Amino acid sequence: MKIIGLQSSSSLARKVAEQLHSELVLPEERRFPDGELYVRYDADLNGEDVFIIGNTHTDAEIIEMILSLSAVRDYQVKSVNIIAPYYGYARQHQRYRRGEPISSQIFTEIFASYSTSIATVDIHDEQTLSYSKVRFTDLHADRSIIDFYRHVDIDYVVSPDDGGLQRVKHVAEALGKKYFYIEKKRIDDRTVEMKAPDIDLNGKKVLILDDIISTGGTIAKSSSILRQKGASKIYVSAIHGLFVNSSESKILENADEIHVTDTVAGKFSDISVYQVVCDYIAGKHA
């Protein structure tokens, strides 16, 4: 078995390789003068189960993944398996308006044509899984988050909307904490009102948990609401921390701490999903 770590996930891939006592293979990469990407693998991959760990968030990451798949397949590998901790374009899992592509379907079909299996962590919408002709597994980071907060003093786990309530319920019950969600009510096509339930939060410590932090608007507003209700400590966590346009700054106007998983590497990625990935690989390689 060999673990390949692409640029976006090299740190996570290293942790996985160390835990599984497997060789970590890193690609030789450079840019041509015209900006195109060169990828080469100088390793003995013949007869191996190969696991490529890398995100498909940015266009550059997608190109790196496709070129890597093609290069690895040139060896007589036993299998080539994609693990994309953050699976990009999954929010375009259907056609919302005429003339749009179903982006996640296009990329999933490409990846499936070059691989034996695909896995990701908490995909945005499970519709994307159905677009693959090979097994596509959605792993879950709940256990990593639960382990991280197991010894942190928290009174409530909060979902910033009702859509994430089941995840919050699961985490809260595992931690033995109470939970609730912040209600969203659309006033008009430009205005959404957010309101917390009538709960006394004076002096309480709360954890806001979401699947993705992108622009951070919902999380920032949720933090503000909870602070106004008297919360003394506000933790913010998410599975995927994208932090578009440095959105962490507006979140930290009211939140005290931010902790996200390392599906996307960054300054707040101190909750690792490496054990979740290791267990998945061990199960396939058994």
Swiss-Prot record:
Residues the entry annotates as binding Mg(2+) 2: D161
Entry-linked Pfam families: Pribosyltran, Pribosyltran_N
GO molecular function terms listed in the Swiss-Prot or TrEMBL record: ATP binding; kinase activity; magnesium ion binding; ribose phosphate diphosphokinase activity
Gene3D superfamilies in the record: 3.40.50.2020
UniProt: D-ribose 5-phosphate binding residues: R186, D210, S214, T215, G216, G217, T218
GO cellular component annotations of the record: cytoplasm; ribose phosphate diphosphokinase complex
Cofactor: Mg(2+)
Residues binding ATP, per UniProt: D34, G35, E36, R91, Q92
Cofactor binding remark: Binds 2 Mg(2+) ions per subunit.
Reaction catalysis annotation: D-ribose 5-phosphate + ATP = 5-phospho-alpha-D-ribose 1-diphosphate + AMP + H(+)
Active-site residues annotated for this sequence: K184
Localization, UniProt: Cytoplasm
Protein residues bound to Mg(2+) 1: H124
Domain of life: Archaea
Function: Involved in the biosynthesis of the central metabolite phospho-alpha-D-ribosyl-1-pyrophosphate (PRPP) via the transfer of pyrophosphoryl group from ATP to 1-hydroxyl of ribose-5-phosphate (Rib-5-P).
UniProt record similarity statement: Belongs to the ribose-phosphate pyrophosphokinase family. Class III (archaeal) subfamily.
Name the record gives this protein: Ribose-phosphate pyrophosphokinase
Lineage start: Archaea, Methanobacteriati, Thermoplasmatota, Thermoplasmata, Thermoplasmatales
